[in-house]
Amino acid sequence: MAVISGSDSVLLSNGSISTSTSNPSPLSPSDGDLPAQHLGPRETPRTKASPNGCLQLNGTVKSSFLPLDNQRTPQTPTQCCHPCPYHHPVSSHSNHQECHPEAGLAASPALASCRMQPHSEYSASLCPNHSPVYQAAHCLQPSPSFCLHHPWPDHFQHQPVRQHLTIIRPSRPFKFPRSYAALLADWPVVVLGMCTLLIVVCALVGVLVPELPDFSDPLLGFEPRGTTIGQRLVTWNNMMRNTGYKATLANYPYKYAEEQARSHRDDRWSDDHHERERREVDWNFQKDSFFCDVPSDGYSRVVFASAGGETLWNLPAIKSMCDVDNSRIRSHPQFSDLCQRTTAVSCCPSWTLGNYIAILNNRSSCQKIVERDVSHTLKLLRTCAKHYQNGTLGPDCWDKAARRKDQLKCTNVPRKCTKYNAVYQILHYLVDKDFMTPKTADYAVPALKYSMLFSPTEKGESMMNIYLDNFENWNSSDGITTVTGIEFGIKHSLFQDYLLMDTVYPAIAIAIVLLIMCVYTKSMFITLMTMFAIISSLIVSYFLYRVVFNFEFFPFMNLTALIILVGIGADDAFVLCDVWNYTKFDKPRAETSEAVSVTLQHAALSMFVTSFTTAAAFYANYVSNITAIRCFGVYAGTAILVNYVLMVTWLPAVIVLHERYLLNIFTCFRKPQPQAYDKSCWAVLCQKCRRVLFAVSEASRIFFEKVLPCIVIKFRYLWLIWFLALTVGGAYIVCVNPKMKLPSLELSEFQVFRSSHPFERYDAEFKKLFMFERVHHGEELHMPITVIWGVSPEDSGDPLNPKSKGELTLDSTFNIASPASQAWILHFCQKLRNQTFFHQTEQQDFTSCFIETFKQWMENQDCDEPALYPCCSHCSFPYKQEVFELCIKKAIMELDRSTGYHLNNKTPGPRFDINDTIRAVVLEFQSTFLFTLAYEKMQQFYKEVDSWISHELSSAPEGLSRGWFVSNLEFYDLQDSLSDGTLIAMGLSVAVAFSVMLLTTWNIIISLYAIVSIAGTIFVTVGSLVLLGWELNVLESVTISVAVGLSVDFAVHYGVAYRLAPDPDREGKVIFSLSRMGSAIAMAALTTFVAGAMMMPSTVLAYTQLGTFMMLVMCVSWAFATFFFQCLCRCLGPQGTCGQIPFPTKLQCSPFSHTLSARPGDRGPSKTHAASAYSVDARGQKSQLEHEFYELQPLASHSCTSSEKTTYEEPHTCSEFFNGQAKNLRMPVPAAYSSELTKSPSSEPGSALLQSCLEQDTVCHFSLNPRCNCRDAYTHLQYGLPEIHCQQMGDSLCHKCASTAGGFVQIQSSVAPLKASHQAAEGLLHPAQHMLPPGMQNSRPRNFFLHSVQHFQAQENLGRTSTHSTDERLPRTAELSPPPSDSRSTESFQRACCHPENNQRRLCKSRDPGDTEGSGGTKSKVSGLPNQTDKEEKQVEPSLLQTDETVNSEHLNHNESNFTFSHLPGEAGCRSCPNSPQSCRSIMRSKCGTEDCQTPNLEANVPAVPTHSDLSGESLLIKTL
């Protein structure tokens, strides 16, 4: 309720008015005009406008920035955002020379959002002499406003006619922005224009200058570079590429060879021999055969399985496979152009089971076979299977020319098993390897699970249209059989198309995130511009990546950065918008530049922490040896940092522009306007939308501010045990069993589509099930041992460009021709053949160790022929150098001519340069190790062979000491690089996260807890991926290393909030961090989760894996940060300076300066000047200390409760003290006490209390620093006659706290007193600024307050005061009753009965105005006696913590004015205590751990009002959120 000047009329929040007659106040204005001093133009004070309800130049009092849910007000307010009709003409001045306290009369809280914005050159003044007209600016909140300059009764009874208002727009000379925030506030369009220009230039340069990326080869870059094996493999490949005719190296001595023969310029020495040979189809046009050729790897093929899980060896299934072949492949219009032909009109038949059964049973086609043919063929296969299995039945047992069995081969094989080679081809190509095993010999019908179909078309790009037209959208089944695997040779080509087509899923994710962001911010403009900033981040980072960093390779994985950036960018936008709205709520009348400065100071730090940790996790991938991973890490990390830069330049300018011009562009989000009831569908829809949003807002507020803290704290031990168990289980899965498996597919079979795709199933499953694939892909092939001399194993290419492999670097010390080298290398070959890992081949080996072959050739030459000398047997080994150099050339040419064995670039032996000088030597042997994809076996092979060769080379002569060994180790090197690189990247990410956390909080304990939480997140996430069947491949390595960057964000936010919490105890800090950051973190997790979920339908594996990972890591990270980390802090969290790193004050981050700056020794009286710096300077000059703390307030002190011990920094004007209207009252404590001391004798109780306050050494409730001690801070505060101005108040209070930033009381509110609340329309005032911003979803603003109004009469009418010590957890409220002798109303006044305690701790108590005092604390009870003067001492309950002290008036003299409390609509769960204490019992309480959680009473007639229990006698100090 509010007070009317001249009478004690009380307006309750439910609309009723309670009045009581009183003596008129001596300060009541006679005409309702503003008294002002008449000053000269040069004497006009040019002070900074007070942002929180200060007196303005035109006599108005800035109304607060408040959305209210005043649904009980019966009338509709007048329209907001118009020129104020109650302004006086510009020329009207008052002759009064004093600044009376009635200078500004507050507007109704329901009308408090009509923001009057002065130009910057007009400054606020306490006693202005002019009234410059303010422009009626747009409304900032969804509640209309009035601009009132008359006393309330006169105004509402006699509303004047709208006067003509002259709008004066003073010229604004150009002034260079004082700061970056001023630049954003004054020139947002310029900032946006510059950013747009930069983005456009980067886009044009990035697209036009370098070549566009090519994704045709998705496997490009998936190879290690820079490792020992990698360098050797690159050098070996360079050797093969540079070996040939007229190349750097050659197998033949060409100068010598040209003298012998000039026919060696064959294609076998061409440059393209270094590429991987690909077997081409050797078309065989034999018309006398049913089939045109033998099926081979070069043909397109399809794998069938039974649709019902039965065997395929039955007549319907066999015919079904033929039907699918005819309907899906052979019927395609392009098939006739692609197929192999025997005649001009017909294509060759496909190799299917049906056609083989037909040829064996003399049927014309597959459709003609019968059941008997199937049985006969099965019997034949059973008879011949053993010959195939023991190797006697081969592919050449049938003589096609003679059309009979080859008489010279397969002598032990029955003739029927060799007919047409059908049995061999069926068992080798068409059926799986388990069909005719000895285990199935006794089965009546062996189970044929899979069957292959070969089509007479070459696989490759030509099959693309057939697949897209007939297979892509087909359900792959005809009811009998199902196509489970396809190999058309178009996997990588199709991947490039799918990579572009599946970008629709990231687009859907972006759209949904946009929708969430739009609902959250209620601004389509901010949403679209945020998304534009995210897309621009990718564009600018692409420019930096390609042009500035000069990266030539752009892997396809870089496209997935968009998905990660959408989630991070949305999170940053939420943080910035939240802090902006916190600032606007806390400083509703702050200049735009100041609001931007405060917002950036806190939001920029928060966004930087999250962006830097995630970017660091990406950049940590640069330590990997795999090219694609390194490039992706650089690009993604750069994109996140660029996004951060745009979020602190682009987005603030967007918000300023939106706040200034575009606030009402969308009608549904527009503030309610007073208009006739609109029954249109759009109006009804908007109204319902607002109601739904409000309901969701309230539900989320209740959950995050009440339910979630209650759940976390009450079950904290259960949560700790549960999440520790999960961590241990995840660590066991990751490290012990089953462990994260390394890749099981070769690089050529690298998975690019989802696992269910038929292309991927063929590579992953069916290649292992058919014998021709097992033999072709190296199963059971021996690993080669290749030893090389003469070339240095150096990779001189660009490791960031997979196409740059460098050039050969020859070893200048190499010398094989010396006798010592000849003898050593021969001995080396002999020793190697004696090793256990050497495999002896049956065939004669001419090339393995060339020195052995050369020595044997020399010994076989007859020296009788003069032409052979000296290359003959007369020479003994080792040979002279000149003999060796000459004879080696003859031996090579003779070997080529006599044996017909042609040497190629892979053949071991000597390598010659263009001068026929031996520059390199290659030896190659077969090992007993078989090729496998198992990492352990390959590691054993490499370690064993490499260690033996290294040991032997240590004794080699100088010319052979630099040899090295290589083999087919590409896949093993990839596995090794992935396993090591992933662990290193994760460790580096954790180290960076710990460093950032430490630098952010300056607390070791919190940082360690955060790292423990991150470790648990990593173990559980990776363990879950292991159980999902993930293998540690390239994509998986990237995603897992990024898990650190994505999971650290939540712990950092909670940790910072824990440090910022003003509560001294752990529980209060945990509740503060949960209520402050809970909803913001949940929204961040939700947006990232949604972005990941939208990836799941994608065909591209990179999208689906990233989506799976993002969903999993968001859920696990949120759970660990919310329950595990917070429970750790609740049980073992630091208190006070525990774990705090001492750091110089000047170098601290500003959010912690208030907690780090004060020391116990800084509380002396010599520091009191710092406290007075917060008072209003008549010259408008604020100290630097005030300015620094002013910007700390929105994050550090959004609420002020009895347990927070936090003050607010913004001073108030005298008029706000004396007129009884508090809009944003912030009163310097020393000033208040100084005023009290000047008027009260030292013998009065108030003075005694004051002296005791200065003597005691306990916590000061007015200090931001919880270590600052000043007990009994709330004492007898009284404001005297209007002549006492703010600057006249002393600064003698609480000298022990004066040095800190917290020497002031702020009676803060975003609400003006109810002047015309009965005019507010029910249902039109929307309470929710956002849908879910933390702490602002409630039906009141965060800094809601109740103020008291008192009419001062005389200084000597002072009531006695006493000190009450109230419990921090169970706050009390007092009920003030006037004496019965009072000639005015004897009605008891009502006091708010709820103390929010950070919106968490609530208890309703009814108290008597009589105070009880005791040494240990006091406890009040309701008393029905109106004239109680005696003080009783009550003992506080043992479980209660005594931290807050309040000074309450014991009695009010009947000559003194009465107190009235303006009960405004407030938070659910709080209501005014009526006269009877029994009424408070309607408010239910439930015990939540150690907290008292209050349940709202929905049946309250008077809206609930949150107040603070710290109440002073004649000047009620009420602190709330």
From Swiss-Prot:
Primary location recorded for the protein, binned into one broad class: membrane
Q: Which residues cross the membrane?
A: 189-209, 499-519, 524-544, 548-568, 603-623, 637-657, 717-737, 986-1006, 1008-1028, 1038-1058, 1081-1101, 1109-1129
* Glycosylation sites recorded in the entry for this protein: 14, 58, 390, 581, 1455
PROSITE patterns given in the database record: SSD (PS50156)
Question: Would the keyword Signal turn up in this protein's UniProt record?
Answer: no
Protein's membrane topology: Multi-pass membrane protein
What ranges does the record give for the region Disordered, renumbered to this chain? 1-55, 1355-1440
SUPFAM superfamilies (alphabetical): Multidrug efflux transporter AcrB transmembrane domain (SSF82866)
Q: Phenotype on deletion?
A: Death at or soon after 9.5 dpc probably due to abnormal embryonic turning and looping of the heart. Embryos also display defects in development of the forebrain and branchial arches.
Q: What keywords are assigned to this protein?
A: Developmental protein, Glycoprotein, Membrane, Transmembrane, Transmembrane helix
Citing just one GO molecular function, the answer is: molecular carrier activity
Compositionally biased intervals (Low complexity):
11-35
The superkingdom of the source organism is: Eukaryota
Amino acid composition bias (Polar residues), ranges on this chain: 1-10, 1355-1364, 1418-1428
One Gene Ontology cellular component term attached to this UniProt record is: membrane
Q: Where in the cell is it found?
A: Membrane
State the oligomer form and interacting partners. Interacts with SHH; via the cholesterol anchor of the dually lipid-modified SHH (ShhNp).
What is this protein's function per UniProt?
Functions in hedgehog (Hh) signaling. Regulates the release and extracellular accumulation of cholesterol-modified hedgehog proteins and is hence required for effective production of the Hh signal. Synergizes with SCUBE2 to cause an increase in SHH secretion.
Q: What is this protein called?
A: Protein dispatched homolog 1
Gene that encodes it:
Disp1
